[in-house]
């Protein structure tokens, strides 16, 4: 396991255990961290679902936001930035008990903006569940 992966695991432990919104991600497991790429997994549980028993769109958006931000922290600059724009395209449902893989890529990082893409896929079938794009302002 790389030191980057180990360091990020420690950050995630703290983030997901303190009071606040990030606790909704406490079931997310970090698989690997590399410069500009992060892979996580999560088993869909009842607490993650909408009334139809599928992964809630709001949680999907939170995964896009948080996992892409952590991927940005794995770059040389290491700045998490603040969100400027985010969009998510929902393509297929994820049901209770299904394992999903969340893969974030940093597409470009400039002086003030960074651009990321995030794919959520079914771990068993590889089917694309959702795809997100996230633009972050990095400051001056």
Curated annotation (Swiss-Prot):
Sorted UniProt keywords: Acetylation, Cytoplasm, Cytoskeleton, Hydrolase, Lipid metabolism, Mitochondrion, Nucleus
One of the record's GO molecular function terms: fatty acyl-CoA hydrolase activity
Subunit structure: Homotetramer. Interacts with PCTP.
Subcellular compartments: Cytoplasm, Cytosol; Mitochondrion; Nucleus; Cytoplasm, Cytoskeleton, Spindle
Organism field: Mus musculus
GO CC list: cytosol; mitochondrial matrix; mitochondrion; nucleus; spindle
GO biological process per UniProt: lipid metabolic process; negative regulation of cold-induced thermogenesis; protein homotetramerization
Gene name linked to the record: Acot13
N6-acetyllysine modifications at: 27, 37, 43, 108, 127
Protein name: Acyl-coenzyme A thioesterase 13
Record EC number: 3.1.2.-, 3.1.2.2
Recorded catalytic activity of this chain's protein: a fatty acyl-CoA + H2O = a fatty acid + CoA + H(+); decanoyl-CoA + H2O = decanoate + CoA + H(+); octanoyl-CoA + H2O = octanoate + CoA + H(+); butanoyl-CoA + H2O = butanoate + CoA + H(+)
Keyword set includes Secreted: no
Residues annotated with N-acetylmethionine modification: 1
Main location: cytoplasm
Superkingdom: Eukaryota
Family note: Belongs to the thioesterase PaaI family.
Binding site for CoA: 46, 83, 90-95, 108-113, 137
């Amino acid at each position: 396991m790389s030191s980057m992966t180990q360091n990020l695991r420690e950050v995630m432990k703290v983030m997901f255990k303190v009071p606040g919104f990030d606790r909704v991600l406490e079931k997310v497991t970090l698989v690997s961290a590399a410069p500009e790429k992060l892979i996580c997994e999560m088993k869909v549980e009842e607490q993650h679902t909408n009334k139809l028993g599928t992964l809630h769109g709001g949680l999907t958006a939170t995964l896009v936001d948080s996992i892409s931000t952590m991927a940005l922290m794995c770059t040389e600059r290491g700045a998490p930035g603040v969100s400027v724009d985010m969009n998510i395209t929902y393509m297929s449902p994820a049901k209770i008990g299904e394992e999903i893989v969340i893969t974030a890529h940093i597409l470009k990082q400039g002086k003030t903006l960074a651009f990321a893409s995030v794919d959520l896929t079914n771990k068993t079938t590889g089917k694309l569940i959702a795809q997100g794009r996230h633009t972050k302002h990095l400051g001056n």
